A protein has these predicted regions:
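A short acidic/small-residue loop/turn micro-motif
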Residues: 142-146
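Conserved hydrophobic/amphipathic alpha-helical signal-anchor segments
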Residues: 6, 25, 30-78
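Short, flexible coil/turn micro-motifs enriched in small/turn-prone residues
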Residues: 2, 13-16, 36, 84, ...
Length: 160
């Protein structure tokens, strides 16, 4: 008696595995690029949130001065995740300069730089900054934080 069972041959299974591998090779880089773009969008949005929170802080509890991320978080002006200075693959920093009566107004600048700057797990390809004027700046020339407010302002302005 012949025992004939229906099923897939080894060749057919290998062909299916090869096709899945080809599809994955095409899809994965696109997914990683989408993730980087989402991280960059989140970083820009977070910087705009910081800018808005700084205005509220200065007008309410800052006595004319701006606050640090920790101070903004303590007043519930920004997301608690953002007060840890790390969100969506970016590291954030905020540097206020206090008001000096009769000499200079209070200012601040905030920056966002990618946590991972190279390789497959790269979290972003650009750094961003925003200052007291509210204009978003960004570039990919260096993936380190801007040194000061003048460096933020000197960077190319993004479509605001």
């Amino acid at each position: 008696m012949k025992n004939k069972q229906a099923g897939f041959s080894l060749i057919e299974l290998l062909i299916v595995v090869a096709i899945i591998g080809i599809i994955a090779a095409i899809a994965i880089p696109n997914l990683l690029a989408s993730r980087r773009a989402a991280n960059e969008g989140s970083a820009q949005s977070s910087l705009r949130t910081i800018h808005s929170a700084e205005g509220t802080y200065q007008a309410t509890v800052g006595a004319g001065n701006y606050g640090t991320l920790a101070q903004l978080g303590a007043q519930n002006l920004i997301d608690p995740v953002l007060t840890t200075a790390s969100k969506s693959g970016y590291n954030f920093g905020c540097t206020p300069t206090d008001l000096v009566a009769g000499t200079s107004p209070a200012t601040f600048y905030a920056t966002a730089v990618p946590q991972v700057t190279s390789g497959v797990g790269q979290s972003g390809t650009r750094r961003f900054g925003i200052s007291t004027d509210g204009v978003m700046h960004g570039d990919s020339t260096a993936l380190t934080a801007y040194a000061n407010e003048a460096a933020v302002i000197a960077a190319p302005a993004l479509g605001n």
